[in-house]
């Protein structure tokens, strides 16, 4: 189930984001989290199954557009379709928006058929 990021999930969110190639350094990771926490057009969502948060997807909302900035799944839950489920849930949440990828999410989104 896709849920909106809340501050009490910060450590989990940072851990999941750290799997992204661009988020390896702590300072960069902290800057990214600050963007999501302070900019209304930056939205961060977590994927929860039962009581476990196992995935994260971050987007920038622009006029009629959703640009996927970050997508990551806990390594022990990969290759189970979690990433695709997160993208589908986002498309259900923003049905009238065009979805775009950035250079780091493009290959994955292409596999999802976007």
Task: List the model feature ranges, each with a label.
Residues 41-55:
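Conserved beta-hairpin
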Residues 65-75:
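Conserved acetyl-CoA binding element of GNAT-fold acetyltransferases
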Residues 93-114:
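Conserved GNAT acetyl-CoA-binding A-motif
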Residues 1-28:
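Short amphipathic alpha-helix that is part of the acyltransferase structural core
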Residues 73, 79-92:
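Conserved acetyl-CoA-binding loop-helix of GNAT-fold acetyltransferases
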Residues 35-39:
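Short loop/turn motifs at secondary-structure junctions and domain boundaries
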